[in-house]
Amino acid sequence: MLASRDSDSRRTTVRKTSDREVVVTRTFDAPARLVFEAWSRPELFKRWWVPRFMGMTLRSCEMDVRTGGKYRLVFGDDPASEMAFFGNYIEVVPNQRIVWTNEESGDEGSITTVTLEERDGKTLLVMSELYPTREAFDAAGTGAQEATHETFAQLDELLAELSAR
């Protein structure tokens, strides 16, 4: 298991399950419908996806969250330091599952699967990042997985706001 970064680490776990896969789990105090909206509505996604400690902003967020749809996310402080991430949605089941490709690395890109399971008004989220090879997994490093702790804490804040409405 990789180390936890957030103050509520008992709620987020990051585990390397094979030499090609990492799985993150977290329980959110919100219904699956709201968690899905936060993952699928660009105006909400922009508010939580980039960890604050990185000091960057999500400059552009284009998402067509449906099976066969595409996404493109552009990060950076200014146009000279922009990084683009893009891919396709392989499967989307509202309030239950989103599967997408990460194509910025070409053939070495991963496939991300997010599943949502609601129980008693809370949602268990399981996010799997599967790489095509061990070498691709190793090249990706653990930075993104470690940043997930802060990102999910930010998602918690957004979900609390949405739940209060």
Segments predicted by a language model, with ranges:
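Beta-strand/loop substructures that line and gate deep hydrophobic ligand-binding cavities in soluble
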Residues: E21, V99-E150
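Hydrophobic pocket/interface hotspot
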Residues: V35, F45, Y71-L73, Y89, ...
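Hydrophobic/aromatic beta-strand elements that line small-molecule binding cavities or substrate pockets
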Residues: R26, S60-M63, F85-E91, N102, ...
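Short beta-edge strand/loop motif at the mouth of beta-sheet-based domains
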Residues: V23-V24, E43-E82, R165
